[in-house]
From Swiss-Prot:
It comes from Streptococcus pyogenes serotype M1. The modification 2-(S-cysteinyl)pyruvic acid O-phosphothioketal is found at C116. It holds the Pfam family EPSP_synthase. This is UDP-N-acetylglucosamine 1-carboxyvinyltransferase 2. Cell wall formation. Adds enolpyruvyl to UDP-N-acetylglucosamine. Its main location: cytoplasm. It comes from the Bacteria. It catalyses: phosphoenolpyruvate + UDP-N-acetyl-alpha-D-glucosamine = UDP-N-acetyl-3-O-(1-carboxyvinyl)-alpha-D-glucosamine + phosphate.
Amino acid sequence: MRKIIINGGKALSGEVAVSGAKNSVVALIPAIILADDIVILDGVPAISDVDSLIEIMELMGATVNYHGDTLEIDPRGVQDIPMPYGKINSLRASYYFYGSLLGRFGQAVVGLPGGCDLGPRPIDLHLKAFEAMGVEVSYEGENMNLSTNGQKIHGAHIYMDTVSVGATINTMVAATKAQGKTVIENAAREPEIIDVATLLNNMGAHIRGAGTDIITIQGVQKLHGTRHQVIPDRIEAGTYIALAAAIGKGVKITNVLYEHLESFIAKLEEMGVRMTVEEDAIFVEKQESLKAITIKTSPYPGFATDLQQPLTPLLLKADGRGTIIDTIYEKRINHVPELMRMGADISVIGGQIVYQGPSRLTGAQVKATDLRAGAALVTAGLIAEGKTEITNIEFILRGYASIIAKLTALGADIQLIED
């Protein structure tokens, strides 16, 4: 069993570069199946989710070369075969294969997706959109069968009942090679959607409106190869900004797009966090007094659900009482009992997280229950006095590239142990 050991209380300083966006690349890689030639992605993060996606692509017949942060995929050999359940079950973003396989073959046999357990994240919105485009859905054991019965998937006018990043991207990808025009209303607006649309348009797609709540896709017959730069990971950036504010004495976070983090930075400024925003970087000063605030997550451009857990250890250093309300994923509270083990004055009341600061954290044995909860525990361990041992770290490695090396370079006493 692998675990992370942190000897906390050491102030961090220096510079850390943000990697490419996990939430983009897990959609970009499956979308490449639609191409008729080689596609190259630059800025690909070294995370286990990428490794899993590469393995799936190779099992399906793609030729893949991955060196440094550059990923080259030739999808011409991809075959219409049932997708491997084991890999699919461990990877939530595997549902992005639905849209690309339907777009290329008009059918797909896939296992249901896995990933972090954050409560209801139904794929009903995806399936409703596919059905509007002529897809029939059936189930056989652990597999889901999607088929157009030999017909070409067709365009449709689709209204998303709930704002959903995954369903928006999946529908957009499926519509790229569909016959006719597709309109997605109440579409999600996240930067990662724009990133996927940019890749597809560079391949020859006709997508307009990505980043707004109405996206229009005019189907095309062929998509050529291209080269694409993955956008910076705004969630990783926010995690390091919060971490730097909590235990830093001057940390510069580079490869940051401020416009992707405006709501997050506004809440930090409300707390009293002192920082300087540069063209593609943010410098976080050593903090003095911070005040407690209320956080309420909402779809982009609101406060990202993925950032409420990584921010929690910093909130615990603030003076006063505050609350965290996650309107996106109701079960995103699993970090709370682990932080309580470390001495945090924090609890869940009526589905809301309530905290009282400042809390003095001490090292403890804790368990990462999901990706962003794991990030919260890493920050808490860096703040805490004494030794913190984090288990179940596979969740953390799913989404944070080179996290041990990056934190070590900032002066953290942190190591990954293989038991």
